[in-house]
Amino acid sequence: MGNEFIASASISFIITLIGLTLGFALLKLQGE
């Protein structure tokens, strides 16, 4: 049960990190 929570937590963290990176890149591209 603990392993499943850790796995889902890291997956959602990675997805959030990717989303933030993509959003930041899009903002920089639009700013130019």
Curated annotation (Swiss-Prot):
Localization in the cell: Plastid, Chloroplast thylakoid membrane
Membrane topology (UniProt): Single-pass membrane protein
Write down any Gene Ontology CC term. chloroplast thylakoid membrane
**Any single Pfam family the record assigns to this protein:** PetM
Protein keywords? Chloroplast, Electron transport, Membrane, Photosynthesis, Plastid, Thylakoid, Transmembrane, Transmembrane helix, Transport
Which terms in the Gene Ontology molecular function aspect does this entry carry? Answer: electron transfer activity
**Per the UniProt entry, what is one GO biological process?**
photosynthesis
* Transmembrane regions: 5-25
Function summary: Component of the cytochrome b6-f complex, which mediates electron transfer between photosystem II (PSII) and photosystem I (PSI), cyclic electron flow around PSI, and state transitions.
Assembly and partners are described as:
The 4 large subunits of the cytochrome b6-f complex are cytochrome b6, subunit IV (17 kDa polypeptide, PetD), cytochrome f and the Rieske protein, while the 4 small subunits are PetG, PetL, PetM and PetN. The complex functions as a dimer.
The UniProt similarity line reads: Belongs to the PetM family.
Protein name from the UniProt record:
Cytochrome b6-f complex subunit 7
Species the sequence originates in: Guillardia theta
